[in-house]
Protein backbone atom coordinates (compact mmCIF):
# COMPACT_ATOMS: atom_id res chain seq x y z
CA UNK A 1 0.00 0.00 0.00
CA UNK A 2 1.33 3.46 -0.94
CA UNK A 3 1.96 5.72 2.04
CA UNK A 4 0.80 9.32 1.72
CA UNK A 5 3.53 11.83 2.49
CA UNK A 6 1.48 14.53 4.13
CA UNK A 7 4.31 17.08 4.44
CA UNK A 8 5.10 16.82 0.69
CA UNK A 9 1.44 17.29 -0.27
CA UNK A 10 1.04 20.26 2.07
CA UNK A 11 4.21 21.86 0.62
CA UNK A 12 2.86 21.52 -2.94
CA UNK A 13 -0.49 23.04 -1.90
CA UNK A 14 1.30 25.91 -0.08
CA UNK A 15 3.44 26.62 -3.19
CA UNK A 16 0.40 26.66 -5.44
CA UNK A 17 -1.43 29.06 -3.11
CA UNK A 18 1.59 31.38 -3.02
CA UNK A 19 1.83 31.33 -6.82
CA UNK A 20 -1.88 32.10 -7.30
CA UNK A 21 -2.34 35.52 -8.81
CA UNK A 22 -5.86 36.89 -9.04
CA UNK A 23 -5.93 38.96 -12.24
CA UNK A 24 -9.08 40.13 -13.97
CA UNK A 25 -8.91 41.25 -17.61
CA UNK A 26 -11.84 42.96 -19.25
CA UNK A 27 -12.13 42.23 -22.97
CA UNK A 28 -14.64 43.97 -25.20
CA UNK A 29 -16.04 41.13 -27.33
CA UNK A 30 -18.78 40.53 -29.84
CA UNK A 31 -20.23 37.83 -32.08
CA UNK A 32 -20.23 37.65 -35.88
CA UNK A 33 -23.81 37.94 -37.18
CA UNK A 34 -23.04 38.03 -40.90
CA UNK A 35 -19.92 38.00 -43.07
CA UNK A 36 -19.33 38.39 -46.82
CA UNK A 37 -18.06 40.77 -49.54
CA UNK A 38 -15.28 42.00 -47.25
CA UNK A 39 -17.79 43.21 -44.64
CA UNK A 40 -18.77 41.68 -41.28
CA UNK A 41 -21.65 42.67 -39.00
CA UNK A 42 -20.93 42.16 -35.32
CA UNK A 43 -23.33 41.98 -32.36
CA UNK A 44 -21.81 43.27 -29.12
CA UNK A 45 -18.55 45.27 -29.06
CA UNK A 46 -20.43 47.92 -27.03
CA UNK A 47 -17.30 49.95 -26.16
CA UNK A 48 -15.71 49.93 -29.65
CA UNK A 49 -14.48 53.24 -31.10
CA UNK A 50 -14.92 54.43 -34.69
CA UNK A 51 -11.87 53.35 -36.69
CA UNK A 52 -10.69 50.89 -34.00
CA UNK A 53 -9.05 47.64 -35.05
CA UNK A 54 -10.92 44.45 -34.14
CA UNK A 55 -9.52 40.92 -34.23
CA UNK A 56 -11.48 37.87 -35.33
CA UNK A 57 -11.06 34.41 -33.79
CA UNK A 58 -9.11 33.09 -36.80
CA UNK A 59 -6.65 36.02 -36.89
CA UNK A 60 -8.15 38.38 -39.52
CA UNK A 61 -8.08 42.05 -38.52
CA UNK A 62 -10.83 44.53 -39.41
CA UNK A 63 -11.70 48.21 -38.89
CA UNK A 64 -14.94 49.22 -37.16
CA UNK A 65 -16.45 51.83 -39.51
CA UNK A 66 -20.20 51.74 -38.83
CA UNK A 67 -21.36 52.03 -35.21
CA UNK A 68 -25.10 51.33 -35.25
CA UNK A 69 -27.59 50.88 -32.41
CA UNK A 70 -27.74 47.08 -32.61
CA UNK A 71 -24.60 46.07 -34.52
CA UNK A 72 -21.15 47.19 -35.67
CA UNK A 73 -20.15 47.24 -39.38
CA UNK A 74 -16.55 46.08 -39.82
CA UNK A 75 -14.48 46.14 -43.02
CA UNK A 76 -12.00 43.27 -43.28
CA UNK A 77 -8.28 43.77 -43.97
CA UNK A 78 -7.98 40.44 -45.73
CA UNK A 79 -10.21 37.92 -47.50
CA UNK A 80 -11.82 36.66 -44.26
CA UNK A 81 -12.64 33.28 -45.84
CA UNK A 82 -12.18 31.41 -42.54
CA UNK A 83 -14.48 33.66 -40.48
CA UNK A 84 -17.64 31.84 -39.38
CA UNK A 85 -20.96 33.20 -38.21
CA UNK A 86 -21.22 32.97 -34.44
CA UNK A 87 -17.44 33.18 -33.91
CA UNK A 88 -16.14 35.75 -31.43
CA UNK A 89 -14.48 39.11 -32.18
CA UNK A 90 -12.51 41.24 -29.74
CA UNK A 91 -11.69 44.95 -29.80
CA UNK A 92 -7.95 45.66 -29.65
CA UNK A 93 -8.04 49.22 -28.31
CA UNK A 94 -5.71 50.32 -31.15
CA UNK A 95 -6.23 52.19 -34.40
CA UNK A 96 -4.42 51.34 -37.64
CA UNK A 97 -0.69 52.06 -37.53
CA UNK A 98 2.36 50.91 -39.47
CA UNK A 99 6.06 50.48 -38.64
CA UNK A 100 8.31 53.15 -40.23
CA UNK A 101 12.08 53.34 -40.79
CA UNK A 102 14.82 54.14 -43.32
CA UNK A 103 14.93 50.40 -44.14
CA UNK A 104 11.78 50.80 -46.29
CA UNK A 105 13.76 52.62 -49.01
CA UNK A 106 14.10 50.47 -52.12
CA UNK A 107 11.30 48.09 -51.07
CA UNK A 108 7.85 47.19 -52.42
CA UNK A 109 5.23 46.90 -49.66
CA UNK A 110 1.46 46.53 -49.29
CA UNK A 111 -1.03 48.77 -47.46
CA UNK A 112 -0.14 47.14 -44.12
CA UNK A 113 3.58 47.95 -44.72
CA UNK A 114 4.41 44.26 -45.17
CA UNK A 115 7.05 43.55 -47.87
CA UNK A 116 5.76 41.91 -51.07
CA UNK A 117 9.03 41.87 -53.03
CA UNK A 118 10.32 38.58 -51.58
CA UNK A 119 13.40 40.20 -50.02
CA UNK A 120 12.70 39.37 -46.38
CA UNK A 121 11.35 41.33 -43.44
CA UNK A 122 11.94 45.05 -42.89
CA UNK A 123 13.33 46.08 -39.51
CA UNK A 124 11.63 49.08 -37.89
CA UNK A 125 11.68 50.36 -34.31
CA UNK A 126 9.17 53.22 -34.69
CA UNK A 127 5.55 53.25 -35.81
CA UNK A 128 3.15 55.92 -37.10
CA UNK A 129 -0.62 56.13 -37.29
CA UNK A 130 -1.91 55.50 -40.83
CA UNK A 131 -4.27 58.46 -40.40
CA UNK A 132 -2.62 61.35 -38.57
CA UNK A 133 -3.74 64.98 -38.49
CA UNK A 134 -2.40 67.34 -41.17
CA UNK A 135 0.04 70.09 -40.09
CA UNK A 136 -1.66 73.33 -38.99
CA UNK A 137 -1.13 76.81 -40.42
CA UNK A 138 1.65 77.72 -37.95
CA UNK A 139 3.55 74.50 -38.78
CA UNK A 140 3.74 75.41 -42.48
CA UNK A 141 5.51 77.96 -44.63
CA UNK A 142 4.80 79.01 -48.20
CA UNK A 143 6.28 76.95 -51.03
CA UNK A 144 9.44 78.49 -52.48
CA UNK A 145 11.77 75.69 -53.67
CA UNK A 146 11.26 74.02 -57.06
CA UNK A 147 10.67 70.29 -57.46
CA UNK A 148 12.10 69.67 -60.93
CA UNK A 149 10.19 67.08 -62.97
CA UNK A 150 12.67 67.02 -65.86
CA UNK A 151 9.81 67.79 -68.30
CA UNK A 152 10.23 71.15 -70.08
CA UNK A 153 6.48 71.74 -70.46
CA UNK A 154 5.93 71.43 -66.69
CA UNK A 155 9.07 73.06 -65.28
CA UNK A 156 8.78 76.10 -67.56
CA UNK A 157 5.02 76.75 -67.58
CA UNK A 158 3.35 74.78 -64.76
CA UNK A 159 6.13 74.70 -62.12
CA UNK A 160 5.78 72.45 -59.07
CA UNK A 161 7.26 73.48 -55.72
CA UNK A 162 8.34 71.34 -52.77
CA UNK A 163 5.31 71.00 -50.50
CA UNK A 164 2.76 71.64 -53.26
CA UNK A 165 -0.14 69.38 -54.32
CA UNK A 166 -0.39 69.20 -58.10
CA UNK A 167 -3.06 67.03 -59.70
CA UNK A 168 -2.27 65.02 -62.85
CA UNK A 169 -5.58 64.48 -64.63
CA UNK A 170 -6.56 62.94 -67.96
CA UNK A 171 -8.27 60.04 -69.73
CA UNK A 172 -6.85 56.54 -69.62
CA UNK A 173 -3.76 55.94 -71.77
CA UNK A 174 -2.71 59.60 -71.97
CA UNK A 175 0.61 59.22 -70.13
CA UNK A 176 -0.37 60.19 -66.55
CA UNK A 177 1.81 57.51 -64.94
CA UNK A 178 4.66 58.37 -67.34
CA UNK A 179 4.68 62.01 -66.11
CA UNK A 180 4.73 60.78 -62.50
CA UNK A 181 7.47 58.17 -63.00
CA UNK A 182 9.63 60.64 -64.98
CA UNK A 183 9.37 63.01 -62.01
CA UNK A 184 10.69 60.24 -59.72
CA UNK A 185 13.55 59.43 -62.14
CA UNK A 186 14.52 63.11 -62.18
CA UNK A 187 14.95 63.22 -58.38
CA UNK A 188 18.20 61.23 -58.61
CA UNK A 189 20.87 63.15 -56.72
CA UNK A 190 18.32 65.81 -55.63
CA UNK A 191 18.03 64.48 -52.04
CA UNK A 192 14.29 63.81 -52.41
CA UNK A 193 12.71 60.58 -51.12
CA UNK A 194 9.94 59.36 -53.45
CA UNK A 195 6.90 57.19 -52.78
CA UNK A 196 4.83 55.63 -55.53
CA UNK A 197 1.42 54.38 -54.35
CA UNK A 198 -0.31 52.06 -56.85
CA UNK A 199 -4.03 51.66 -56.11
CA UNK A 200 -6.14 49.04 -57.89
CA UNK A 201 -3.80 48.66 -60.85
CA UNK A 202 -2.79 45.56 -62.77
CA UNK A 203 0.11 43.76 -61.10
CA UNK A 204 1.91 43.73 -64.49
CA UNK A 205 1.75 47.57 -64.70
CA UNK A 206 3.19 47.94 -61.19
CA UNK A 207 5.95 45.41 -62.00
CA UNK A 208 6.81 47.43 -65.12
CA UNK A 209 7.15 50.65 -63.10
CA UNK A 210 9.32 48.91 -60.46
CA UNK A 211 11.56 47.45 -63.21
CA UNK A 212 12.02 50.95 -64.72
CA UNK A 213 13.01 52.32 -61.31
CA UNK A 214 15.48 49.47 -60.74
CA UNK A 215 17.08 49.83 -64.18
CA UNK A 216 17.51 53.60 -63.73
CA UNK A 217 18.80 53.36 -60.12
CA UNK A 218 15.74 55.15 -58.73
CA UNK A 219 14.78 52.44 -56.20
CA UNK A 220 17.62 53.64 -53.92
CA UNK A 221 15.48 56.62 -52.87
CA UNK A 222 11.99 55.22 -53.64
CA UNK A 223 9.37 53.18 -51.75
CA UNK A 224 6.56 51.51 -53.72
CA UNK A 225 3.24 50.85 -51.94
CA UNK A 226 1.11 48.53 -54.07
CA UNK A 227 -2.44 47.21 -53.70
CA UNK A 228 -3.38 45.68 -57.04
CA UNK A 229 -6.82 45.21 -58.62
CA UNK A 230 -7.35 41.84 -56.89
CA UNK A 231 -6.73 43.27 -53.38
CA UNK A 232 -9.66 43.73 -50.97
CA UNK A 233 -11.37 47.14 -51.24
CA UNK A 234 -10.32 47.96 -47.65
CA UNK A 235 -6.63 47.68 -48.51
CA UNK A 236 -7.04 49.72 -51.72
CA UNK A 237 -8.72 52.40 -49.57
CA UNK A 238 -5.90 52.33 -46.99
CA UNK A 239 -2.89 52.27 -49.38
CA UNK A 240 -2.65 56.09 -49.92
CA UNK A 241 -2.76 56.73 -46.15
CA UNK A 242 0.04 54.19 -45.62
CA UNK A 243 2.14 56.00 -48.24
CA UNK A 244 1.39 59.37 -46.60
CA UNK A 245 2.42 58.02 -43.16
CA UNK A 246 5.79 56.88 -44.56
CA UNK A 247 6.31 60.23 -46.33
CA UNK A 248 5.46 62.10 -43.11
CA UNK A 249 8.06 60.08 -41.21
CA UNK A 250 10.76 61.49 -43.52
CA UNK A 251 9.20 64.98 -43.69
CA UNK A 252 9.31 65.37 -39.90
CA UNK A 253 12.96 64.28 -39.99
CA UNK A 254 13.73 67.41 -42.06
CA UNK A 255 13.86 65.57 -45.40
CA UNK A 256 12.17 66.35 -48.73
CA UNK A 257 9.65 63.78 -49.98
CA UNK A 258 7.45 63.41 -53.03
CA UNK A 259 4.46 61.06 -53.15
CA UNK A 260 2.45 59.91 -56.15
CA UNK A 261 -1.06 58.45 -55.71
CA UNK A 262 -1.85 56.41 -58.84
CA UNK A 263 -4.77 56.85 -58.87
CA UNK A 264 -7.35 58.38 -56.51
CA UNK A 265 -10.32 57.48 -58.77
CA UNK A 266 -9.71 53.82 -57.90
CA UNK A 267 -9.43 54.62 -54.19
CA UNK A 268 -12.78 56.47 -54.36
CA UNK A 269 -14.34 53.44 -56.11
CA UNK A 270 -13.00 51.10 -53.39
CA UNK A 271 -14.42 53.41 -50.72
CA UNK A 272 -17.76 53.56 -52.56
CA UNK A 273 -17.86 49.75 -52.63
CA UNK A 274 -17.19 49.57 -48.87
CA UNK A 275 -19.76 52.27 -48.09
CA UNK A 276 -22.54 50.71 -50.19
CA UNK A 277 -21.93 47.30 -48.62
CA UNK A 278 -22.12 48.94 -45.18
CA UNK A 279 -25.47 50.37 -46.36
CA UNK A 280 -24.42 54.00 -46.01
CA UNK A 281 -26.69 56.34 -48.01
CA UNK A 282 -25.33 56.98 -51.53
CA UNK A 283 -24.99 60.49 -52.96
CA UNK A 284 -23.90 61.87 -56.34
CA UNK A 285 -22.63 59.10 -58.70
CA UNK A 286 -23.43 56.66 -55.82
CA UNK A 287 -20.40 57.88 -53.83
CA UNK A 288 -20.97 58.37 -50.09
CA UNK A 289 -21.35 61.89 -48.69
CA UNK A 290 -17.87 61.97 -47.14
CA UNK A 291 -15.88 61.15 -50.30
CA UNK A 292 -14.60 64.75 -50.37
CA UNK A 293 -13.24 64.29 -46.84
CA UNK A 294 -11.65 61.00 -47.95
CA UNK A 295 -9.36 62.93 -50.33
CA UNK A 296 -9.04 66.24 -48.46
CA UNK A 297 -7.69 64.65 -45.28
CA UNK A 298 -5.16 62.73 -47.39
CA UNK A 299 -3.94 65.65 -49.54
CA UNK A 300 -3.85 68.18 -46.68
CA UNK A 301 -1.03 66.12 -45.16
CA UNK A 302 1.27 67.36 -47.94
CA UNK A 303 3.08 70.46 -46.67
CA UNK A 304 6.21 72.56 -46.56
CA UNK A 305 7.28 72.55 -42.89
CA UNK A 306 8.15 75.80 -41.12
CA UNK A 307 11.73 76.61 -40.09
CA UNK A 308 10.93 75.52 -36.49
CA UNK A 309 10.14 72.02 -37.78
CA UNK A 310 13.24 71.81 -39.97
CA UNK A 311 11.80 72.85 -43.38
CA UNK A 312 11.09 69.30 -44.54
CA UNK A 313 8.48 68.90 -47.27
CA UNK A 314 5.98 66.47 -48.72
CA UNK A 315 4.91 67.11 -52.31
CA UNK A 316 1.79 65.24 -53.43
CA UNK A 317 1.10 64.38 -57.08
CA UNK A 318 -2.32 62.72 -57.09
CA UNK A 319 -3.54 61.18 -60.36
CA UNK A 320 -7.22 61.16 -61.35
CA UNK A 321 -8.68 59.45 -64.40
CA UNK A 322 -11.44 61.17 -66.39
CA UNK A 323 -14.01 59.64 -68.75
CA UNK A 324 -13.69 61.16 -72.25
CA UNK A 325 -12.22 64.40 -70.95
CA UNK A 326 -15.04 65.19 -68.50
CA UNK A 327 -13.30 67.29 -65.84
CA UNK A 328 -16.65 68.27 -64.30
CA UNK A 329 -17.41 64.79 -62.91
CA UNK A 330 -17.63 64.37 -59.11
CA UNK A 331 -14.16 63.06 -58.17
CA UNK A 332 -12.20 65.28 -60.64
CA UNK A 333 -13.92 68.48 -59.40
CA UNK A 334 -13.37 67.44 -55.76
CA UNK A 335 -9.65 66.83 -56.21
CA UNK A 336 -9.18 69.95 -58.40
CA UNK A 337 -10.66 72.04 -55.57
CA UNK A 338 -8.33 70.47 -52.97
CA UNK A 339 -5.06 70.70 -54.93
CA UNK A 340 -2.84 73.69 -55.79
CA UNK A 341 -3.22 73.30 -59.54
CA UNK A 342 -3.57 70.60 -62.18
CA UNK A 343 -1.71 69.22 -65.18
CA UNK A 344 -4.33 68.25 -67.76
CA UNK A 345 -3.35 65.55 -70.25
CA UNK A 346 -5.37 65.44 -73.45
CA UNK A 347 -5.99 62.30 -75.52
CA UNK A 348 -6.26 64.45 -78.70
CA UNK A 349 -2.75 65.83 -78.17
CA UNK A 350 -1.47 62.35 -77.28
CA UNK A 351 -2.87 60.91 -80.51
CA UNK A 352 -1.42 63.85 -82.48
CA UNK A 353 2.05 62.79 -81.29
CA UNK A 354 2.53 65.63 -78.79
CA UNK A 355 3.98 63.82 -75.78
CA UNK A 356 3.86 64.56 -72.89
CA UNK A 357 0.29 65.44 -73.97
CA UNK A 358 -0.05 68.44 -71.66
CA UNK A 359 -2.83 70.87 -72.49
CA UNK A 360 -1.03 74.06 -71.42
CA UNK A 361 -4.19 76.15 -71.84
CA UNK A 362 -6.16 74.64 -68.94
CA UNK A 363 -3.23 73.39 -66.84
CA UNK A 364 -2.23 75.69 -63.96
CA UNK A 365 0.07 75.83 -60.97
CA UNK A 366 -1.32 78.03 -58.20
CA UNK A 367 2.16 78.39 -56.71
CA UNK A 368 3.43 79.83 -59.99
CA UNK A 369 6.88 81.32 -60.43
CA UNK A 370 7.61 81.01 -56.68
CA UNK A 371 8.52 77.42 -57.55
CA UNK A 372 11.04 78.38 -60.26
CA UNK A 373 14.67 79.43 -60.13
CA UNK A 374 15.33 82.98 -61.36
CA UNK A 375 17.02 81.76 -64.56
CA UNK A 376 13.90 79.81 -65.60
CA UNK A 377 11.65 82.82 -64.89
CA UNK A 378 13.90 85.02 -67.06
CA UNK A 379 13.88 82.64 -70.03
CA UNK A 380 10.42 81.02 -69.87
CA UNK A 381 8.35 83.86 -68.42
CA UNK A 382 6.39 84.49 -71.63
CA UNK A 383 6.29 80.90 -72.98
CA UNK A 384 2.76 80.14 -71.78
CA UNK A 385 1.34 83.34 -73.27
CA UNK A 386 3.15 82.79 -76.59
CA UNK A 387 1.85 79.23 -76.86
CA UNK A 388 -1.70 80.34 -76.03
CA UNK A 389 -1.52 83.04 -78.72
CA UNK A 390 -0.12 80.51 -81.19
CA UNK A 391 -2.97 78.03 -80.49
CA UNK A 392 -5.53 80.80 -81.07
CA UNK A 393 -3.79 81.94 -84.26
CA UNK A 394 -3.51 78.36 -85.53
CA UNK A 395 -7.26 77.83 -85.10
CA UNK A 396 -7.94 81.11 -86.94
CA UNK A 397 -5.43 80.30 -89.73
CA UNK A 398 -7.43 77.21 -90.70
CA UNK A 399 -10.15 79.50 -92.06
CA UNK A 400 -7.92 82.17 -93.64
CA UNK A 401 -6.44 81.46 -97.08
CA UNK A 402 -3.79 84.19 -97.43
CA UNK A 403 -1.86 85.18 -94.30
CA UNK A 404 0.55 88.12 -94.05
CA UNK A 405 4.27 87.51 -93.47
CA UNK A 406 4.20 88.45 -89.74
CA UNK A 407 1.41 85.94 -89.05
CA UNK A 408 3.23 83.22 -91.00
CA UNK A 409 6.38 83.91 -88.97
CA UNK A 410 4.44 83.77 -85.70
CA UNK A 411 2.87 80.44 -86.72
CA UNK A 412 6.27 79.02 -87.70
CA UNK A 413 7.77 80.13 -84.35
CA UNK A 414 4.83 78.61 -82.45
CA UNK A 415 5.17 75.26 -84.23
CA UNK A 416 8.85 75.11 -83.28
CA UNK A 417 8.09 76.08 -79.68
CA UNK A 418 5.55 73.25 -79.50
CA UNK A 419 8.10 70.88 -81.02
CA UNK A 420 10.75 71.64 -78.40
CA UNK A 421 8.28 70.76 -75.62
CA UNK A 422 8.06 67.17 -76.93
CA UNK A 423 10.09 64.68 -74.92
CA UNK A 424 10.64 60.92 -74.92
CA UNK A 425 9.55 58.92 -71.90
CA UNK A 426 12.19 58.33 -69.18
CA UNK A 427 14.44 61.06 -70.64
CA UNK A 428 14.24 63.92 -68.11
CA UNK A 429 16.31 67.06 -68.77
CA UNK A 430 18.31 69.09 -66.24
CA UNK A 431 17.30 72.72 -65.58
CA UNK A 432 20.35 73.96 -67.51
CA UNK A 433 19.33 71.89 -70.56
CA UNK A 434 15.76 73.17 -70.30
CA UNK A 435 16.89 76.82 -70.15
CA UNK A 436 19.13 76.29 -73.18
CA UNK A 437 16.27 74.61 -75.13
CA UNK A 438 13.69 77.33 -74.38
CA UNK A 439 16.14 80.17 -75.09
CA UNK A 440 17.00 78.63 -78.48
CA UNK A 441 13.34 78.37 -79.51
CA UNK A 442 12.09 81.67 -78.05
CA UNK A 443 14.83 83.72 -79.73
CA UNK A 444 14.18 82.40 -83.23
CA UNK A 445 17.31 80.26 -83.64
CA UNK A 446 15.15 77.29 -84.72
CA UNK A 447 13.25 79.26 -87.41
CA UNK A 448 15.58 78.27 -90.32
CA UNK A 449 15.14 74.54 -89.54
CA UNK A 450 12.36 72.25 -90.70
CA UNK A 451 10.10 71.05 -87.89
CA UNK A 452 11.42 67.49 -88.33
CA UNK A 453 15.00 68.68 -87.70
CA UNK A 454 14.31 70.52 -84.43
CA UNK A 455 14.65 67.54 -82.07
CA UNK A 456 17.87 66.28 -83.70
CA UNK A 457 19.44 69.76 -83.60
CA UNK A 458 18.56 70.28 -79.92
CA UNK A 459 20.11 66.93 -78.93
CA UNK A 460 23.35 67.87 -80.73
CA UNK A 461 23.29 71.40 -79.25
CA UNK A 462 23.02 70.04 -75.67
CA UNK A 463 26.00 67.73 -76.28
CA UNK A 464 28.00 70.57 -77.92
CA UNK A 465 27.38 72.91 -74.98
CA UNK A 466 28.24 70.23 -72.40
CA UNK A 467 31.61 69.46 -74.03
CA UNK A 468 32.65 72.91 -75.34
CA UNK A 469 31.00 75.37 -72.94
CA UNK A 470 30.80 73.65 -69.51
CA UNK A 471 30.91 77.12 -67.86
CA UNK A 472 27.24 77.63 -68.87
CA UNK A 473 26.08 74.80 -66.58
CA UNK A 474 28.33 76.05 -63.76
CA UNK A 475 26.93 79.61 -63.99
CA UNK A 476 23.28 78.47 -63.88
CA UNK A 477 23.79 75.91 -61.08
CA UNK A 478 25.85 78.28 -58.89
CA UNK A 479 24.00 81.61 -59.40
CA UNK A 480 20.53 80.21 -60.33
CA UNK A 481 20.39 83.25 -62.67
CA UNK A 482 20.56 83.62 -66.45
CA UNK A 483 23.43 86.12 -66.42
CA UNK A 484 24.78 88.14 -69.36
CA UNK A 485 27.81 85.84 -69.36
CA UNK A 486 25.54 82.76 -69.69
CA UNK A 487 23.63 84.43 -72.53
CA UNK A 488 26.90 85.32 -74.29
CA UNK A 489 27.98 81.66 -74.13
CA UNK A 490 24.69 80.60 -75.75
CA UNK A 491 24.98 83.28 -78.44
CA UNK A 492 28.36 81.79 -79.36
CA UNK A 493 27.43 78.11 -79.10
CA UNK A 494 24.09 78.11 -80.98
CA UNK A 495 25.36 79.60 -84.31
CA UNK A 496 28.48 77.36 -84.13
CA UNK A 497 26.33 74.24 -83.80
CA UNK A 498 23.84 75.53 -86.41
CA UNK A 499 26.62 75.80 -89.04
CA UNK A 500 27.83 72.27 -88.27
CA UNK A 501 24.28 70.93 -88.33
CA UNK A 502 23.39 72.52 -91.71
CA UNK A 503 26.61 71.17 -93.27
CA UNK A 504 25.86 67.75 -91.82
CA UNK A 505 22.30 67.78 -93.22
CA UNK A 506 23.50 68.81 -96.69
CA UNK A 507 26.00 65.96 -96.98
Curated annotation (Swiss-Prot):
Required for activity (site feature) positions: 363
Keywords: ATP synthesis, ATP-binding, CF(1), Chloroplast, Hydrogen ion transport, Ion transport, Membrane, Nucleotide-binding, Plastid, Thylakoid, Translocase, Transport
E.C. designation(s): 7.1.2.2
Subcellular location: Plastid, Chloroplast thylakoid membrane
Root EC class: translocase
SUPFAM superfamilies assigned to the protein according to its UniProt record, in alphabetical order: C-terminal domain of alpha and beta subunits of F1 ATP synthase, N-terminal domain of alpha and beta subunits of F1 ATP synthase, P-loop containing nucleoside triphosphate hydrolases
Record-linked HAMAP family: ATP_synth_alpha_bact
Entry-linked PANTHER family: ATP SYNTHASE SUBUNIT ALPHA, MITOCHONDRIAL (PTHR48082:SF2)
Family: Belongs to the ATPase alpha/beta chains family.
This protein's name: ATP synthase subunit alpha, chloroplastic
Natural source organism: Drimys granadensis
Lineage: Eukaryota, Viridiplantae, Streptophyta, Embryophyta, Tracheophyta
Gene name per UniProt: atpA
